[in-house]
Amino acid sequence: MKLKKWSWIGLLMLCVTLLVGCVDYTSRGYLEELAGKKLSRVYSTENIEDLFEQFPNGFTVSQMRVVGDSTVFVYLEAREKGKPLVGTIKQLNSKTKKEEKSQTIQYVDGKFVFENEEEAKKLWPQGKFLFQGLQLNKDILAKARLHSKQYTNREESPTGDNSFYLEYSIQLPVVNRILGIDESQPIDFSIFGHDESKGFVYEIGAQQDNITTLWEMIREIRK
């Protein structure tokens, strides 16, 4: 009886090993399951302070928007729950990379506080990050038209971690409004993610004429 019992356990372990070994990490289904599960934790979250529920040690958010010859960067850092989130808005010349304008920002009690509100609205007219209004999950990605996908394991990666890339043609009205194009028009949209060794690190971007004109990254602070 003992031999029979251990035989069944051994067979079960073998089956599990074979199933794990057969996982196709490069498949669309696997990558969208991974990306959708992770991104849905954040997209969407209207109140930025609520992200502490996902990342108790803190997080950073970065956004870039290219308009004409200017590139606007918005950066916000959250280190401790209950304290103001602090950051900056900067405008750079896209060609020379020279800083043209800069001001500090804070996020307190569910709203932004700007050093110069009038100037901030000119630099950052949408006044919010994408994740505050954009919903992303596995089902939304599965319905989109996939352009390309790529998976890089840690042995081949220059950064030493697993990473993946997905590029779609997709309708995302929230993004279209920021880009100033018709909401029904599909856009080129990309997702770049890392494995759990670095915590939550995801980037999303929208491309126009093969140039990334809107980009956002959320990174978990790990201690």
Language-model regions, residue ranges each:
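Short, exposed beta-strand/loop patches in secreted or surface proteins that constitute
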Residues: 51-53, 74-80, 104-106, 149-159, ...
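N-terminal leader/targeting segments and the immediate start of mature chains
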Residues: 16-64
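Generic short beta-strand segments
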Residues: 62-66, 92, 167-175
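Gly/Pro-enriched, hydrophobic low-complexity segments
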Residues: 164-223
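Short, hydrophobic/aromatic-rich segments at coil-to-beta transitions
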Residues: 54-62, 83-86, 160-167, 199-202
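Flexible, processing/modification-adjacent segments and terminal tails
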Residues: 108-161
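Sec-dependent bacterial lipoprotein signal peptides
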Residues: 1-22
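An acidic-aromatic
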Residues: 75-131
